[in-house]
Regions:
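Bacterial N-terminal signal peptides
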Residues: 2-13
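Boundary at the C-terminal end of the N-terminal hydrophobic targeting segment
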Residues: 13-22
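Extracellular, repeat-based ectodomains that mediate carbohydrate processing or recognition
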Residues: 22-365
Length: 365
């Protein structure tokens, strides 16, 4: 767990519990180690930090828009930083994602905010295993896609059962979830549209996606219809990739290939058309039986309040449980009675412990 700016630059820290899994005594929220006092994350690029060779590695974007890698050693409480790219984009959407290759070399992926700038996807590979002190030259990927706007939100996945093929998921043109893949980190596939709108909604939606993997043969996806400010009935969906196919949580195959899924084909985990409380996905994990678990925020327009919810696939159906009320949106702009808050769907946040998803972390403003 880490503290990160969502629409502003913030101190980035890691709780001591993130590196010590003994939960006999639950930590205070203030019990964290500082990684940087000038760094931000956005919650739709993952992984933002990984644990390799008893150290934590990750990245962040600073207040000048520069991209950094970091290493944190919990045995000494010392951290190191390395600037990978200078002044890319002053925007939390530019924060990098990170993965480790089979030889423990590190790869960082990043891009500018696709809604404001049209930049490539950048990536860099460390020269040595578990080491941020030296990197190969930064590479560019320029996927050929139809539509407008740029790319952002990188999510790399490597599957050992597919000879360590690397899949890179990201927001592509027209805000649509997209995928490319590589077997050598040099040559990339043509882009694959992952999710598209149900026909009745046209092409204007922007599904927000969270991704996790067992690193072997499965990739788990949770996604929305759109941004919650754009859809009064913004619901939450689930699907899973396995053996080249897209499945529901019960294993039912809905597509023989990766891509071009519409929401009505897969599991609707939370149905906002029944409550008219729109939702936004926050995290996805799975239990020891690889049954998926999601956490998300719901927004009530009746009283302008947020709430956090936990959804678990029990092997037969999805169970949704309320965690807690979550206050209102976290930013505090100048209040004008005649002018409603435009960005009222940004919550403090809710995250799962991926080692034990019975544990979760919340923040309430």
């Amino acid at each position: 767990m880490a503290f990160a700016g969502l629409s502003c630059m913030a101190l980035l820290g890691l709780p001591q519990s993130a590196v010590a899994q003994d939960m006999t005594v639950y930590p205070y929220a203030e019990d964290y180690q500082v990684i940087t006092r000038d760094g931000a994350w956005c919650w739709f690029s993952d992984p933002r930090a990984i644990y390799v060779d008893d150290k934590m590695f990750g990245g962040f974007v600073d207040k000048e828009g520069s991209i950094w890698a970091f290493c944190y050693d919990p045995s000494t409480c010392q951290s190191k930083q390395y600037k990978l790219f200078n002044k890319l984009d002053y925007d939390d959407h530019a924060n990098p994602s990170i993965m480790a290759l089979s030889d423990q070399r590190l790869v960082l992926f990043f891009s500018a905010h696709g809604g404001t700038k049209n930049s490539p996807i950048y990536y860099a590979v460390s020269k040595y295993p578990s080491d941020i002190s030296s990197w190969e030259e930064v590479q560019e990927i320029n996927p050929e896609m139809e539509g407008s706007l740029g790319v952002c939100y990188t999510n790399p996945v490597m599957l050992s059962d597919e000879n360590n093929r690397v899949y890179l998921f990201f927001r592509g043109r027209d805000f649509k979830p997209t995928c490319i893949y590589t077997d050598d980190l040099k040559t990339w596939s043509q882009p694959i549209n992952l999710v598209r709108n149900d026909p009745g909604y046209g092409q204007g939606g922007r599904p927000y996606t969270k991704i996790t993997t067992n690193h072997k043969d499965k990739i788990f996806f949770a996604f929305t219809d759109a941004h919650p400010r754009d859809r009064a009935t913004n619901s939450i969906y689930f699907m899973m990739y396995k053996n080249g196919k897209i499945c529901k949580a019960d294993g039912t195959v809905v597509s023989e290939t990766l891509g071009s899924i519409i929401p009505s084909q897969v599991d609707k985990v939370y149905d906002a058309t029944r409550t008219f409380d729109k939702a936004w996905i926050w995290d996805i994990a799975f239990d020891e039986s690889e049954k998926p678990i999601l956490v998300y925020a719901r927004f009530s327009d009746r009283d302008n309040k947020h709430s956090y919810w936990y959804a678990r696939w029990n092997g037969i159906k999805w169970e949704n449980h309320k965690i807690t009320d979550a206050g209102q949106w976290f930013q505090r702009t100048e209040y004008v009675k005649e002018k409603p808050e435009y960005e009222c769907n940004y919550s403090g946040g809710v995250y799962l412990d991926h080692e034990n998803p019975n544990i979760l972390y919340t923040s309430r403003p």
